[in-house]
Regions:
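Peripheral, non-catalytic segments of secretory and membrane proteins
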Residues: 3-118
Length: 118
C-alpha cells in the first residue's frame, strides 16, 4: 500500500483476476482494470460489481433502464457515444441505495484515470 496526500492507495484482486486500484477513503477507482472486451459499447451501460470477476458481471444494457437498478456498492459503467475512448464510472454508496458518491472518467483502452466529474 502506498500513501499519497493523506490517503492510502492500494489494490485488491477479485476472484478470476480482475483488479481494482482504490483509495482508502472509499472504493473510488484510481485505475480501471476491466478488460476492454467487458466494457459496454459506446452508448450503452453496464452494472459492475468490483468484487466479482469479469465473467460473472451482468450483461450491458440500456442506460436509462440500468440506472434505476444499480445496487448499493456497485458501479454503473457508461460509454458516451460522443466519447468512445472514455468510460464513465458512477460509484454508488455502499449503504444508501441510488446515491452516487463519485463519477470518475477513464481511458477505455488503458484504464488510466482521466478526470473526476462533479
Amino acid at each position: 500500500m502506498q500513501v499519497r496526500w493523506g490517503w492510502a492507495l492500494g489494490r485488491t484482486r477479485a476472484p478470476g483476476g480482475a483488479s481494482v486500484t482504490y483509495r482508502s477513503d472509499g472504493l473510488f477507482p484510481s485505475a480501471l482494470h476491466i478488460p476492454p472486451g467487458h466494457l459496454p459499447a459506446p452508448g450503452m451501460c453496464r452494472i459492475w460489481f468490483p468484487s466479482r470477476p469479469p465473467g460473472q458481471q451482468p450483461p450491458p444494457g440500456d442506460c436509462t433502464e440500468l440506472a434505476g437498478r444499480v445496487p448499493p456498492g456497485a458501479w454503473l459503467l457508461t460509454r458516451p457515444p460522443d466519447q468512445r475512448e472514455r468510460v464513465h464510472v458512477r460509484v454508488y454508496d455502499q449503504q444508501r441505495p441510488g446515491v452516487v458518491i463519485v463519477i470518475r472518467v477513464f481511458d477505455a483502452l488503458t484504464g488510466r484515470f482521466v478526470e473526476e466529474l462533479h
